[in-house]
Amino acid sequence: VAMLAKDIDIVLLGADRISRSGCVSNKMGSFAAVLCARALAPNAEVVILSESDKIVIDTDLKTHAEEKNDKFEIRRAWGERWERTEKELKLGATQGLVTKNVYFETVEGKHIDRFICETGVLSKEDVKRVSIQRGVKEEEIFGPLKEVS
């Protein structure tokens, strides 16, 4: 990523979730790409291309629990090399390699310049407005159900 980042004009990312504050949850490696671009091509823009329904009412994506995906997905990909590596490093079963299988990471809103969706180009203020509107609508629809439970 770093070798290619110095000559870019734009970093174009998708989004799995967009928070009210403009933070984006996207695939692992997205934040690294943004940081490389900011360091090596400071004039490059970071643009999120996504559907507007990815905008959520949460103000911060950090409130979500850390992913706990199956670590054996990674170990299986390495096959026998995994066991060999553990043996070569002389690690026993109780002190084996720690494996985290994380699919998503957060790119903070301060690193994002604009958002593009089916309704057009959105600023961070536009994202905030959409999120607030969704929160109001959710309360109108589901608020009475909260009182029942």
Model-predicted segments: where are they?
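Conserved phosphate- and dinucleotide-binding cores of soluble alpha/beta proteins
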Residues: V1-S149
